[in-house]
């Protein structure tokens, strides 16, 4: 679909590169990029000033639809006060827990032609919060669209090698080794099978919804429109999967003690956190979300069907169709057993081509990133679990305001907060970045609640 709306992408990570390439392929829209001031951002700014081009290539399964491509960036800004002029579409390509801070800085009055704000990787309640902020800015007619998650798996290509196979499966690749990445060059190794999306009006036929459907269809991604923002956002996979794994005791030990041996987020103990107790937390958190979603007037998901059919399928010899289709009705212990079997089935990619020794691709070798220090010697937490903690805390606060109990979420957060406090006590508060010491989750939860109540 030909679409020429001037588009400003807020965020400049690997996902933004894939997105920019896809937008360029659907029309000759003017493209802008925002990135907050940082070491990586300064390198990107200097590079684009000389060569205003970003590069992308596909690898593995993604090569079927993503060839080597480049895209011209017409405008780069590193201050949100510069987000002015004739931009008609804003796309949030920053982590969902950053939406509030980013949108608070937008000079809305200086965007008179704005038509839409698109959330590339939303969390539950993100759309309501954005809608509330737009209403307060006098932008009630701006269309808000939530995607259930980012539609691909995209990484930076690292500077020391052009061989993308050498890039490690680090869930925070480049976070601790900024100099090793090329912030203008990325590769995509897979696309999602299905993405859920919705706008605040439940209008699946809007021009922007149709355009997004066409963009994703380039990569044979099914798009399922939902009746409202929350209905799409309930399918955010990281909300379900990351907290039980990233906030497990063994993962937190690896996170806060980087000198110890590595851990892998999706491996079974002792290499990773996956064990029956952690899988019980996964099932328990899904039950927490079920209660919250039902209170918000949204139907819960079939967790096993979502994990298998929409994300990473496993052979039926491991997880039967009966388990998948009847998952909500299974007894709790059988649910947990089915989930445990699924995660053991994904220790390797069962559909990869085995090597000469008969070994399949080590799908679960996703290394747990650890705390790290910046150029000012301040300690930071990597995106996983910091983003997940913020999202979970916001939802727990929202649940409390709506008299919904979420015991598993509460226990996971308490475990994290105890581990964080012990770390801060060990290194000293003065040596910690402010992101370790506070957040705006309470404000975000209050805004979501306010917007939800105004619509019910």
From Swiss-Prot:
Domain of life: Bacteria
General function of this protein: Catalyzes the NADPH-dependent reductive condensation of pyruvate to the intermediate formed by the adjacently encoded enzyme y2836, namely (2S)-2-amino-4-{[(1S)-1-carboxy-2-(1H-imidazol-4-yl)ethyl]amino}butanoate, leading to the production of yersinopine. This is the last step in the biosynthesis of the metallophore yersinopine, which is involved in metal acquisition and thus enables bacterial growth inside the host, where metal access is limited. Therefore, this enzyme probably contributes to Yersinia virulence.
Pfam families per the UniProt record, alphabetical: Staph_opine_DH
Species of provenance: Yersinia pestis
Active site: 242 (proton donor/acceptor)
Residues annotated to bind NADP(+): 12-15, 35-40, 154
E.C. designation(s): 1.5.1.-
Catalytic activities: yersinopine + NADP(+) + H2O = (2S)-2-amino-4-{[(1S)-1-carboxy-2-(1H-imidazol-4-yl)ethyl]amino}butanoate + pyruvate + NADPH + H(+)
Entries under InterPro entries matching the protein: NAD(P)-bd_dom_sf (IPR036291), Opine_metallophore_DH (IPR016935)
Class of this enzyme: oxidoreductase
The protein, known as: Yersinopine synthase
Subunit record text: Homodimer.
S-S pairs: none
GO molecular-function terms, A-Z: oxidoreductase activity
Family: Belongs to the staphylopine dehydrogenase family.
Gene3D superfamilies assigned: NAD(P)-binding Rossmann-like Domain (3.40.50.720)
Alphabetical keyword list: NADP, Oxidoreductase
Taxon lineage: Bacteria, Pseudomonadati, Pseudomonadota, Gammaproteobacteria, Enterobacterales
């Amino acid at each position: 679909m030909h679409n020429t709306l001037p588009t400003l992408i807020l965020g400049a990570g690997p996902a933004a590169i894939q997105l920019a390439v896809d937008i360029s392929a659907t029309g000759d829209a003017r493209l802008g990029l925002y990135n907050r001031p940082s070491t990586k951002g300064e390198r990107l700014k200097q590079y684009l000033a000389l060569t205003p081009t970003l590069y992308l290539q596909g690898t593995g399964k993604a090569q079927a639809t993503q060839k080597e491509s480049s895209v011209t960036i017409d405008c780069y800004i590193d201050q949100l006060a510069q987000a002015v002029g004739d931009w008609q579409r804003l796309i949030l390509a920053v982590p969902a827990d950053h939406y509030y801070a980013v949108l608070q800085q937008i000079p809305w009055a200086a965007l008179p032609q704005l038509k839409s704000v698109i959330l590339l990787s939303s969390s539950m309640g993100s759309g309501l919060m954005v809608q509330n902020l737009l209403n307060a800015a006098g932008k009630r007619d701006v269309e808000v669209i939530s995607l259930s998650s980012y539609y691909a798996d995209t990484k930076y290509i690292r500077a020391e090698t052009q061989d993308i196979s050498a890039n490690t499966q680090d869930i925070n690749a480049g976070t601790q080794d900024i100099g090793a990445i090329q912030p203008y060059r990325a590769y995509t190794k897979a696309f999602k099978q299905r993405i859920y999306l919705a706008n605040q009006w439940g209008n699946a036929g809007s021009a922007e919804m149709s355009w997004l459907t066409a963009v994703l269809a380039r990569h044979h991604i099914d798009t399922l429109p939902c009746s409202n923002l929350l209905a799409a956002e309930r399918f955010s996979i990281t909300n379900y999967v990351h907290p039980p794994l990233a906030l497990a005791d063994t993962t937190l030990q690896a996170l806060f003690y980087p000198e110890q041996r590595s851990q892998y987020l999706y491996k079974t103990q002792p290499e990773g956190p996956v064990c029956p107790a952690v899988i019980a937390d996964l099932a328990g958190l899904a039950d927490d979300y079920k209660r919250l979603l039902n209170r918000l007037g949204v139907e819960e998901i079939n967790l096993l069907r979502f994990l298998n059919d929409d994300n990473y399928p496993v052979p039926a010899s491991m997880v039967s169709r009966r388990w998948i289709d009847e998952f909500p009705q299974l007894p709790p212990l059988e649910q947990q057993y089915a989930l445990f079997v699924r995660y053991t089935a994904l220790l390797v990619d069962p559909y990869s081509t085995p090597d000469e020794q008969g070994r399949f691709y080590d799908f679960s070798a996703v290394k747990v990133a650890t705390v790290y220090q910046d150029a000012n010697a301040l300690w930071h937490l990597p995106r996983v679990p910091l983003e997940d903690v913020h999202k979970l805390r916001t939802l727990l606060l929202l649940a409390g305001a709506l008299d919904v109990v979420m015991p598993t979420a509460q226990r996971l957060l308490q475990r994290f907060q105890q581990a964080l406090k012990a770390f801060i006590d060990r290194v000293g508060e003065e040596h910690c970045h402010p992101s370790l010491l506070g957040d705006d989750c309470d404000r975000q939860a209050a805004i979501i609640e306010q917007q939800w109540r105004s619509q019910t």
